[in-house]
Amino acid sequence: MLQKLEFFYLIAFYFLVLGFEVSNFAKLNKENTMAIIITDECINCGACEPECPNNAIYEASDEWKYEEGTELTGLVVLPNGKQVDAAKEQEPISDEFYFIAPDKCTECIGFHEEPQCAAVCPVDCCVPDEDVVETETELLAKKTFMHRD
């Protein structure tokens, strides 16, 4: 018990002295989730695209917009701090297979119990993206931000 308490105080000290924000502490816990990525095993069947409540899934080589499937308009600052023009076409993330725009993916949190793309994918190529780690709270905030509810 004493070691756990000492560890907690050590972590608290680092947060206070080094100026870590509380949101950074959340990234250390085990309740983190990740945006979904479509792997190169994709067979381009398209089953995933209509299932996404955020319109975050696009066909290979398709340009995409932040405003598609959301209530975002004009210049916006995303929850991750990035400023974008919601109406501007974005470059495709993949030229070979379907892709998911990570800034729009909420893992269906706030809509469904599980990511719908993964639920319908016949080859199980919709998997967590380890490069885009977010908490459930962050994903819910992103959903609310995009859909204004």
Describe each region flagged by the PLM.
Residues 43-53, 106, 118-122:
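Cys/His/Pro-rich metal-binding microdomains
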